[in-house]
Amino acid sequence: MKNLVSNLRFFSSYSSSIVPRCSNIPKPILNPLYNLLPQSQNPSKIVDVICSTLNHSDYSVLLPNLRDEVKSLIPHLGYPEISRVLLRFQSDASRAITFFKWVKFDLGKRPNVGNYCLLLHILVSSKKFPLAMQFLCELIELTSKKEEVDVFRVLVSATDECNWDPVVFDMLVKGYLKLGLVEEGFRVFREVLDSGFSVSVVTCNHLLNGLLKLDLMEDCWQVYSVMCRVGIHPNTYTFNILTNVFCNDSNFREVDDFLEKMEEEGFEPDLVTYNTLVSSYCRRGRLKEAFYLYKIMYRRRVVPDLVTYTSLIKGLCKDGRVREAHQTFHRMVDRGIKPDCMSYNTLIYAYCKEGMMQQSKKLLHEMLGNSVVPDRFTCKVIVEGFVREGRLLSAVNFVVELRRLKVDIPFEVCDFLIVSLCQEGKPFAAKHLLDRIIEEEGHEAKPETYNNLIESLSRCDAIEEALVLKGKLKNQNQVLDAKTYRALIGCLCRIGRNREAESLMAEMFDSEVKPDSFICGALVYGYCKELDFDKAERLLSLFAMEFRIFDPESYNSLVKAVCETGCGYKKALELQERMQRLGFVPNRLTCKYLIQVLEQPSLPNHLPEN
């Protein structure tokens, strides 16, 4: 087959005599008795009946009704009959596609691979490429998991029977790539070329790009080698892809050879090519190669631009060589190239990462002096840098300074700083910053920010301020989270405001926020502090029975309080028995408290009788 069709690469064929016939479609076995039947009931006439309907001017209307008219013949419509109908209409793609869809959808029969391939040849030779690609992708999906089916071979075999155009084989490779089956596409690509057919440079580029994304560098070079061997001329896009392949796969000493090869192919390496190479090397930490290319650019009279220098600066920063990066930055400025926000951000980020905040601020002021507007990233990395260094007040002052200079600061940066202040136990500074932002810009903080602020104020026992914020959230119909309730209830119990803590717990229940062992412990602590042991016991019972929360720390707090107040061993023992009936299990600490109360001199000399 390879020898017979090797010179069919670039032209269409409308003769089935060029390729040897392989008689794909079996001839029907005719029974003489069938001729005694009416045509609509004669199995040997099913193809004629269908074709007669298709030849009618109203075929699209008549064909759907044909199923009922020839109902008895439908079981005799097999794959060979479908193929014969398609072949009769190979010069009329509209009727062929109407018939194919009728078989598939109205009759519910699934055409086989051979039927699909005949239809594809008909559509491609009729120049109906989008429709052909649709059915081609459908065929690939049907056969992609069947190793025994080779769509390419069936397509080649089908050329014996009908008009065809070699572009169908190019489309076959594209179809696999379109469906993301890159490795299968590569296999078919080799099959197509080994059989003497051609593939377009556009398809080759798609294949190269797919293989590059899969990190299959050797296969990329194989594709390029085959392209050169069979005479498919690469274009600009080909070399752009190969540039990326080269950066991933090659040694920098081969750069000159690669660039010379590009020139031999008539492709002049330009600034974009060099920038792609430099950027790729810098991203992979291959700075020696990147600077080698930077020198080659001058030798070849290609002047590096802002993109080149930014890539080099970024590579040096990534390697921890911040001072060298800054020197490269100065060299760029000295050569008349004006830095942009990205080049400044690269250096600022590197200095922040090294904890050199003064240098970062200095660069920011330099940006403003050069009329380069800082973006979200600039503000974010500097604020995060101050926070990482534990210099939260410096971060606040920095934000205030930027606002004074009319620099737009993203609210999420301020939000991050507010939360950081809360986590560091500085809720008043956080609240002051939030109030200022709301007053000046009208931004409203997220519920999570308010929750963090309430928690921080509660931890500092600033309960009044915390309750004001909590009321604000409730007025906005926002639900407090469990952490916020924990902080508020814990604070109220700590400062002896147990009734308010109880009200908050009831509010939790109404809001369907489940309490936890911390809230149980906080309330037990508050009740014990007031010597209200009965209430503490009732609370433990409520949590055990309603929420299945058996908190040993809360239980031990109550036992300890009972023992330390001189209530006597008998009362402590009775409490323990009641708790055990609820499901509480005494531990070593419980036993320790009971033993301590037993050893107190004020106790009677004998234990109570059982």
Swiss-Prot record:
Repeat (PPR) residue spans along the chain: 165-199, 200-234, 235-269, 270-304, 305-339, 340-374, 375-409, 410-445, 446-480, 481-515, 516-546, 551-586
PROSITE patterns on file: PPR
Domain of life of the native organism: Eukaryota
Keywords: Repeat
Organism name: Arabidopsis thaliana (Mouse-ear cress)
Lineage: Eukaryota, Viridiplantae, Streptophyta, Embryophyta, Tracheophyta
NCBIfam families membership: PPR
InterPro entries attached to this UniProt entry: Pentatricopeptide_rpt, PPR-containing_protein, TPR-like_helical_dom_sf
Cross-referenced Gene3D superfamilies: Tetratricopeptide repeat domain
Family: Belongs to the PPR family. P subfamily.
Name of this protein: Pentatricopeptide repeat-containing protein At5g40400
